[in-house]
C-alpha cells in the first residue's frame, strides 16, 4: 500500500505539469473551434474544424478582415464566428439599415460573409471588444479545404507606389 501511494505521489507533479501546460496552451496560444452555422459560407462552412488563437485578441493584434470567434451579444453562452469589418474609429456602412455607423472606442463591427443568413453587427450594432475570444488562424477539417483563410480583396492593402 505504501509503495502504491509513493508511486502515485511521484507522478503527481508530472500530471499537474501536463494539465497546466495544456490549459495554458489552449487558453493563451491556440485551440480548436468548430463553426456551427452557415453565416460564414463559403469561407468557413458549417461543421468546419478550425485552429483558433486567443493570442491575437489578448495582444490586440487583430486586423480588419480577420475571422474571429466571439461571444454572442444576445446569448453569452453562444459563440459566433464572423469577419471583423470595422474597428474603433471606423465608419461602417450598414446595408441592413441603409446608413453609416461609427464604431466607438473599445468596440468592433462584425459581419458574416453569407450576408443573407447572418445575424451580425448589421442587426445588433457595434460590439464590445471584450466579447472577442480568438482569431481563426487555419482551417483544419475537412482535409480537402485545409489551409489558411484567404483575406477578401476589399481588406487587402494596395501595393506601395513606386517612384
Descriptions of predicted regions:
Residues 77-87, 125-127, 131:
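Short coil-to-beta-strand transition motifs
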Residues 112:
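Phosphate/adenylate-binding glycine loop and adjacent helical scaffold
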Residues 58, 92-93, 117-118:
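Short beta-strands and strand-coil junctions in structured, solvent-facing domains, enriched
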Residues 49, 67, 91, 107-108:
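Residue-level marker of beta-strand positions
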Residues 1-79, 99-102, 131, 137-163:
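Protein maturation boundaries and topogenic segments
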Residues 101-102, 108, 126:
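A membrane-cytosol interface segment of integral membrane proteins
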Residues 34, 116, 120-121:
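Juxtamembrane cytosolic face of transmembrane helices
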Amino acid at each position: 500500500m505504501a509503495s502504491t501511494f509513493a508511486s502515485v505521489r511521484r507522478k503527481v507533479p508530472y500530471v499537474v505539469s501536463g494539465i497546466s501546460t495544456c490549459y495554458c496552451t489552449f487558453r493563451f496560444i491556440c485551440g480548436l473551434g468548430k463553426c456551427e452555422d452557415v453565416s460564414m459560407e463559403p469561407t468557413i462552412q458549417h461543421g468546419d474544424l478550425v485552429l483558433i488563437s486567443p493570442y491575437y485578441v489578448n495582444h490586440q493584434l487583430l486586423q480588419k478582415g480577420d475571422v474571429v470567434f466571439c461571444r454572442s451579444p444576445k446569448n453569452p453562452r453562444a459563440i459566433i464566428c464572423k469577419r471583423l469589418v470595422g474597428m474603433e474609429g471606423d465608419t461602417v456602412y450598414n446595408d441592413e439599415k441603409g446608413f453609416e455607423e461609427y464604431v466607438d472606442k473599445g468596440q468592433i463591427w462584425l459581419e458574416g460573409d453569407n450576408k443573407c443568413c447572418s445575424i451580425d453587427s448589421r442587426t445588433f450594432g457595434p460590439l464590445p471588444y471584450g466579447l472577442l475570444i480568438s482569431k481563426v488562424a487555419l482551417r483544419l477539417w475537412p482535409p480537402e479545404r485545409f489551409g489558411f483563410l484567404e483575406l477578401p480583396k476589399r481588406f487587402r492593402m494596395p501595393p506601395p507606389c513606386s517612384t
